[in-house]
């Protein structure tokens, strides 16, 4: 039976039949899609995309991502060139890069040669080893870099080159002799070519075919025979632009300097072309230097120049507020931005996940009546997905056909990847189904993303089908494909499959990259296979690769989870010596470890100069090189993973001191915490022996984020009425994160509240999480599923669920025959642990004399008959047991806080916190 097409293919209905209606309950869209009716005058640009320098962009505090490297390896090198088949072959007059395009003869701005005794002095470049090596195939190195080069309007002017130029081009392409013979060939066409238009056409078309050697040879031939300075300037601009497209920035710089010294490179267009060339190679500092130099020589930047420098700064990784200064400057100088300008700014927002700033820019394009194209939409989608706003991204994707802009493979792949990173795999797969229905062919990136999803959710057969389909359409497995398989199987704990895939990868001569090794080490470490991780690290070192922050963070996380926190801290010093700066993920592991039951035991002794125990005598003979240091730690993990000890209460203050020291380091390095950091801090508070210690940690939380502190502190003080509105706003932010990150925050907050007696508050937070679907399918009338909850959240939820069951009984309804409470410690449990949650729930049920008992066939399941539970709920004493109360009064908490503050002040010297408070 033929499928019914999606409504929006033929009508304006935006709903897709494969997907649940948006917005999802509990995942509400925080703001509407961009509106074409928005009207903001240019005078108010500073309010919509504010005066860009002080723009109020969304903070990265709630990115919640532990590591983009491990989340989705399938998103690397996603190029939009695949949707632009004419990119590598443009007729003359259709500029391959407006930033480097040649000026009309009548508009060339020049400076007299007498004023230019010396060319600008540019800093030395970090350029490719070989100026004309075959490495430069014209492909962009990253999805981000390529994305913004296709938002330009195509030139529609009539073709200005002659048929003789086409003949000369074909002869040049077919030529295979030496330079002298090439020169003779071009001489034979000299009388037939019609000036610089023909020459510019030949230069660009040779460049489009990656014949840069011949392009340079022809340029040198043509520029010597051209006597007019402005025409020579056109040729120089075209040559620099062509070289820049292919990363040959050293040659482009030489061409520019020669032209400048000859008096025909002193044009806005030549400078703009060189700026663009630097930008395409990620050399934004050099691009800015050229930009400043042209102003020193009396040249006024035009739209092409500003677009080039903005694009260069974005590609170079400059912060948005810094890039926006050029936007402010161009407007002050009366240069009005166009679509290229906005697309470049959108790309900066995309890289940093600044989705609110991206939406402001997008709306401003509408206000200025600047038409958005598919690249504008794709970049907006990328920013929104990176910001975790998946419902909004879905709505914008649906809006595109209504705006007569059809989504392409990049549009779908961007949103699909966003859903996958958010753990919303069903929606990602539904979009893949829609792509197939609409006839949008999957490319390598799409296949790799789909493969990554199937392996992560354990659908091995579908993953194999995708591999077979890739082979059938001629797409070979590359390093991204293998990384997706390794990451997916690793997350599923299928380590035999991991080994098979890695063996096949080497057999097929696909070279592992840094991500491959990081994925393997992270997967093996999390699975406790430290010997395997150590062997992978040895291979990694022998391959001559250098560890990065992701690999170090994976090892540090493994050390922390095994109680070897001191060794983890010492490894931070090692990575710093290697010139690798720790990031928020690194410190989150440390904070979380101090807040859990793992102990520093022997690692603390090592950090004070003690010796490490090793699994073999060979390890102890290793020298203290960086590689051997890591191998030693793997040896320690192998030994310690089977020899954990319980936490000694006397270590509490020592660990508290270490957490405060970690905070100090984060402040010094200006590392902004995210929601994972906040969850780790709350976990640490839950394990403090006294309210005073917890208050000290919360005071540090205030330095990081006063809003989060206000909500947490208010709830802990029992001031729910005063802070609940702010709490709702905080929960909105948390709900933008992926499911596991959001549930971790709710678990940590409820644990802390429960630990310090705010049990009613813990219950309200747990119910809020349920209403927002933080824990999906957590309860029904017959079952309460607690396997994704912490101890505090689970106990609070048991009370709430039983009260709900009681209301059903008193409404006269019959309960199901069997009631179940699942704790995730049974045969099919998704939780790896020691059954602490099960024991906590068991103690709670016994304390209430609830008629639930452990199932004989499932040690993680408590069951009871509905009739027995109904009888128990009707007992007069039961209601009193079920209703939770807070056991810390505001007055008591305030007094304790005051004492804690005094205690903290007395200890400021030892914790070295005083400079941070100034």
From Swiss-Prot:
Transit peptide stretch: 1-41
Deleted gene: phenotype: Defective in retrograde plastid-to-nucleus signaling.
One Pfam family this sequence matches: PPR_3
PPR repeat residue intervals: 232-266, 267-301, 302-337, 338-372, 373-407, 408-442, 443-477, 478-512, 513-547, 548-582, 583-619
Single GO cellular component term: chloroplast
Region Disordered, residue ranges: 1-138
Location(s), subcellular: Plastid, Chloroplast
Low complexity bias: start-end ranges: 28-43, 90-100
An annotated GO BP: chloroplast-nucleus signaling pathway
Keyword 4Fe-4S: no
SMART domains, A to Z: SMR
Domain Smr: 781-873
Entry keyword set: Chloroplast, Plastid, Repeat, Transit peptide
Compositional bias of kind Polar residues: 1-15, 44-87, 115-136
Molecular function terms, GO-annotated: DNA binding
UniProt keyword Signal present: no
Function: Involved in nuclear gene expression via the retrograde plastid-to-nucleus signaling. Plastid signals that depend on GUN1 can affect photomorphogenesis developments, such as cotyledon opening and expansion, anthocyanin biosynthesis, and hypocotyl elongation.
Family: Belongs to the PPR family. P subfamily.
Protein name: Pentatricopeptide repeat-containing protein GUN1, chloroplastic
Source taxonomy: Eukaryota, Viridiplantae, Streptophyta, Embryophyta, Tracheophyta
């Amino acid at each position: 039976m033929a499928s019914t097409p999606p409504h929006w293919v033929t009508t304006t209905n935006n709903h897709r039949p494969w997907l649940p209606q948006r917005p999802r309950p509990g995942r509400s869209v925080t703001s509407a899609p961009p509106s074409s009716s928005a009207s903001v005058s240019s005078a108010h640009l500073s309010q919509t995309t504010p005066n860009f320098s002080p723009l109020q962009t969304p903070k990265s505090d709630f990115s919640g991502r532990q590591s983009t490297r491990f989340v989705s390896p399938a998103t690397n090198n996603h190029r939009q060139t695949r949707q632009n088949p004419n990119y590598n072959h443009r007729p003359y007059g259709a500029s391959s890069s407006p930033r480097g395009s040649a000026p009309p003869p009548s508009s060339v701005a020049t400076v007299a040669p007498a004023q230019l005794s010396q060319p600008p002095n540019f800093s030395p470049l970090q350029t490719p080893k070989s100026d004309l090596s075959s490495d430069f195939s014209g492909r962009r190195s990253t999805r981000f870099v390529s994305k913004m080069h296709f938002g330009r309007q195509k030139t529609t002017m009539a073709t200005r080159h002659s048929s003789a130029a086409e003949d000369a081009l074909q002869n040049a392409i077919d030529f295979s002799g030496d330079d002298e013979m090439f020169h003779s060939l071009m001489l034979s066409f000299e009388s037939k070519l019609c000036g610089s238009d023909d020459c510019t056409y030949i230069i660009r078309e040779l460049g489009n075919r990656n014949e840069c050697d011949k392009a340079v040879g022809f340029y040198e031939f043509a520029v010597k025979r051209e006597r007019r300075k402005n025409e020579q300037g056109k040729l120089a601009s075209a040559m620099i632009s062509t070289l820049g497209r292919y990363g040959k920035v050293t040659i482009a710089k030489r061409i520019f300097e020669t032209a400048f010294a000859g008096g025909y490179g002193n044009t806005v267009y030549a400078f703009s072309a060189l700026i663009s060339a630097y930008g395409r190679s990620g050399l934004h500092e050099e691009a800015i230097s050229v930009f400043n130099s042209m102003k020193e020589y009396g040249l006024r930047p035009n739209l092409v120049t500003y677009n080039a420098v903005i694009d260069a700064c974005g590609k170079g990784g400059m912060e948005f507020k810094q890039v926006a200064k050029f936007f402010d400057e161009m407007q002050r100088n009366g240069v009005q931005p166009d679509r290229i300008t906005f697309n470049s700014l959108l790309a900066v927002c995309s890289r940093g996940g600044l989705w609110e700033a991206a939406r402001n820019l997008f709306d401003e394009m509408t206000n200025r009546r600047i038409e958005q194209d598919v690249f504008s939409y794709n970049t907006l989608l990328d920013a929104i997905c990176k910001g975790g706003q998946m419902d909004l991204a879905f709505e914008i994707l649906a809006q595109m056909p209504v705006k007569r802009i059809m989504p392409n493979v990049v549009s779908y792949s961007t949103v699909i990847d966003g859903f996958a990173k958010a753990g919303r795999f069903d929606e990602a797969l539904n979009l893949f189904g829609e792509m197939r229905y609409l006839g949008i062919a999957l490319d390598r990136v799409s296949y790799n993303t789909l493969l990554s999803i199937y392996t992560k959710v354990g659908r091995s057969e579908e993953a194999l089908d995708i591999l077979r389909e890739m082979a059938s359409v001629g797409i070979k497995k590359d390093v991204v494909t293998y990384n997706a398989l390794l990451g997916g199987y690793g997350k599923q704990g299928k380590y035999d499959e991991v080994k098979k895939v890695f063996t096949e990868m080497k057999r097929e001569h696909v070279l592992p990259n840094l991500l491959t090794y990081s994925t393997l080490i992270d997967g093996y470490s999390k699975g406790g296979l430290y010997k395997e991780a150590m062997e992978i690290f040895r291979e990694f070192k022998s391959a001559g690769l250098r560890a990065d922050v992701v690999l170090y963070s994976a090892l540090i996380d493994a050390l922390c989870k095994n109680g070897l926190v001191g060794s983890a801290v010492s490894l931070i010093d090692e990575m710093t010596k290697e010139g690798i700066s720790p990031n928020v993920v690194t410190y989150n592991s440390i904070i979380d470890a101090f807040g859990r039951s793992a102990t520093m035991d022997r690692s603390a002794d090592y950090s004070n100069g003690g010796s490490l125990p090793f699994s073999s005598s060979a390890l102890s003979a290793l020298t203290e090189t960086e590689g051997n240091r890591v191998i030693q730690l793997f040896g320690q993990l192998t030994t310690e993973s089977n020899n954990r000890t319980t936490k000694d209460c006397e270590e509490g203050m020592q660990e508290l001191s270490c957490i405060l020291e970690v905070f100090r380091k984060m402040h010094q390095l200006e590392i902004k915490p995210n929601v994972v950091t906040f969850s780790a801090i709350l976990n640490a508070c839950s394990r403090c022996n006294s309210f005073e210690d917890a208050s000290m940690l919360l005071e540090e939380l205030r330095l990081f984020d006063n809003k989060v502190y206000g909500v947490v502190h208010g709830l802990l003080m029992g001031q729910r009425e005063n802070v609940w509105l702010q709490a709702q706003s905080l929960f909105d932010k948390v709900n933008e994160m992926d499911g596991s990150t959001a549930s971790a925050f709710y678990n940590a907050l409820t644990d802390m509240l429960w630990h310090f007696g705010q049990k009613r508050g813990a219950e309200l937070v747990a119910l809020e999480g349920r209403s927002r679907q933080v824990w999906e399918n957590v309860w029904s009338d017959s079952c309460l599923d607690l396997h994704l909850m912490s101890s505090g959240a689970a106990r609070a939820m048991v009370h709430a669920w039983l009260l709900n069951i009681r209301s059903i009984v008193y409404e006269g309804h019959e309960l199901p025959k069997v009631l179940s409470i699942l704790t995730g410690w049974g045969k099919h449990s998704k939780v790896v642990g020691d059954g602490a949650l099960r024991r906590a729930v068991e103690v709670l049920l016994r304390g209430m004399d609830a008629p639930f008992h452990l199932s004989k066939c499932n040690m993680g399941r408590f069951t009871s008959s509905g009739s027995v539970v109904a009888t128990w709920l009707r007992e007069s004493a039961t209601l009193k047991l079920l209703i939770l109360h807070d056991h810390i009064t505001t007055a008591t908490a305030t007094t304790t806080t005051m004492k804690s503050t005094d205690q903290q002040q007395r200890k400021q010297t030892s914790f070295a916190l005083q400079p941070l408070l100034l």
